[in-house]
A protein has these predicted regions:
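A membrane-topology feature that recognizes alpha-helical transmembrane segments
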Residues: 1-159
Length: 159
């Protein structure tokens, strides 16, 4: 029963981060730290705490790669430090399945982005979109499908 309490607070923090990022285009360190504390407690009691560091490292590496590419392309911080740390926190939570979720979310975000461009009267360069809500909105769906692997995601979308 306690597992659901931890999961509730983790998802509540992800919702809080998403709403604040949507409104203010900022992710606060205190929210990320509190999320990491809830994830660490959850992992200590119900998961493999040490294997979660693999996911944390993967999230951090992916976040830093995106940050550096976006900074080189745009010349300013369009993908910020909060987004990088959010990916690390998400990796810590999802551990080994982080890359699978990231691919899952990016595929669905690609479809969403094309629909936004088709339905919007704005040009692509005029659309500002906060990253946290777009990344985290698919998390319940990912858990609903029982955290599928990349191959299962491919079969789900294209079969």
């Amino acid at each position: 029963m306690l597992i659901y309490v931890f999961l509730f607070f983790i998802f509540l923090m992800f919702i809080r981060i998403s709403v604040i990022d949507w409104r203010e285009h900022a992710i606060y360190d205190k929210d990320i730290v509190l999320t990491m504390v809830f994830v660490a407690l959850y992992k200590v009691f119900y998961g493999d705490f040490f294997s979660s560091f693999y996911g944390l490292a993967m999230g951090l590496i992916v976040g830093l790669l995106i940050f550096s590419v976006v900074y080189k392309v745009y010349g300013f911080e369009a993908f910020g430090q909060g987004d990088v740390i959010l990916l690390a926190a998400l990796g810590f939570f999802l551990d080994m399945s982080f890359l699978h979720y990231f691919a899952f979310a990016m595929m669905l975000n690609g479809i969403l982005g094309v629909l936004m461009l088709l339905l919007s009267r704005k040009h692509a360069e005029d659309i500002e979109l906060a990253y946290a809500p777009v990344l985290l909105v698919w998390l319940p769906l990912y858990f609903y499908f029982n955290k599928p692997s990349l191959w299962a995601i491919y079969n789900l979308l294209f079969s």
